[in-house]
Amino acid sequence: ACAATCGSVCYTSSAISAAQEAGYDLYSANDDVSNYPHEYRNYEGFDFPVSGTYYEFPILRSGAVYSGNSPGADRVVFNGNDQLAGVITHTGASGNNFVACD
């Protein structure tokens, strides 16, 4: 089952957890790959179920964990307490904005 659908891409809860874990591990080590994770400022005004500061990290359609190069369109968003805020995508959004994944 899809825990999040970004455009036509289905992400399972385990894929989301793996991306969040990889992003949070880098965040907590004060490290990054290709400038991810970085602070997500929520200019779009999403009503996330957890409070921020938020960080974004790519979640890849291939199922691999992001290790650099092209981040693709989709992101997991988590806070500094390693709580998942949501999954967002550039797919279907204008310019460099994000929309929520279903």
From Swiss-Prot:
Task: Give me the reactions it catalyses.
Answer: [RNA] containing guanosine + H2O = an [RNA fragment]-3'-guanosine-3'-phosphate + a 5'-hydroxy-ribonucleotide-3'-[RNA fragment]
Tell me the active site.
Answer: 38, 56, 90
A single MF term (Gene Ontology): ribonuclease T1 activity
Instruction: Please name one Pfam family that this protein belongs to.
Output: Ribonuclease
Q: Which Cys pairs are S-S linked?
A: 2-10, 6-101
What InterPro entries does the entry give? Answer: N1-like (IPR000026), Ribonuclease/ribotoxin (IPR016191), Ribonuclease_N1/T1 (IPR051386)
Instruction: Kindly state which keywords UniProt assigns to this record, in alphabetical order.
Output: Disulfide bond, Endonuclease, Hydrolase, Lyase, Nuclease
Record-listed E.C. numbers:
4.6.1.24
Stated family: Belongs to the ribonuclease N1/T1 family.
- The protein's name is Guanyl-specific ribonuclease Pc
